[in-house]
Amino acid sequence: NIDFANTSGAFVSGEADYTVEFEPAATLIEEQGAGYVVASVGKESGYVPYTAYSVKKSYLETHKELLEAFTRAIEKGQEYVNTHTPEQIAKVIAPQFKDTDRKTLEKIVERYAEQDSYKENTKFEKESFTLIQDILEEAGELEKRVDYET
């Protein structure tokens, strides 16, 4: 059992035979010649709603316009990544990845596009909702399923 922050280091040093990494760590391991990306957990598992935003009902009721604007901003970002090149996207996101060079960012963005990681909209599909509940249930983290229509 290795702390998540140390998984790539453990793999590169030979303490682990495999690792599951987020980007940019996965691509950096490849660039160091220390390993290869052989599969995408996301692609192999199906679309899992990995990132979600939630607020209390009281906040929703008092900040409806703000939350609608936030949702439009997310959709605008989705539209951007679906209509621009990896080079253009890498240029925009580069300030968020100060320790990662532009070519590496381009490679990561391209990999995500090839894996169909970028959604076209913010709709939380029933199939994905069921899949995340299956995963949580199998892990023993879900006491009771929630109806999609709720």
Regions found by a protein language model. Give the residues of each.
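Short beta-strand-to-loop elements that line the ligand-binding cleft
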Residues: 1-3
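Pocket-lining segment of extracytoplasmic ligand-binding domains
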Residues: 5-97
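Residue-level detector of short coil/turn "hinge" positions at structural boundaries
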Residues: 36, 143-144
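Secondary-structure end/capping motifs
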Residues: 61-143
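Hinge/cleft segment of the Venus flytrap/periplasmic-binding protein
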Residues: 144-150
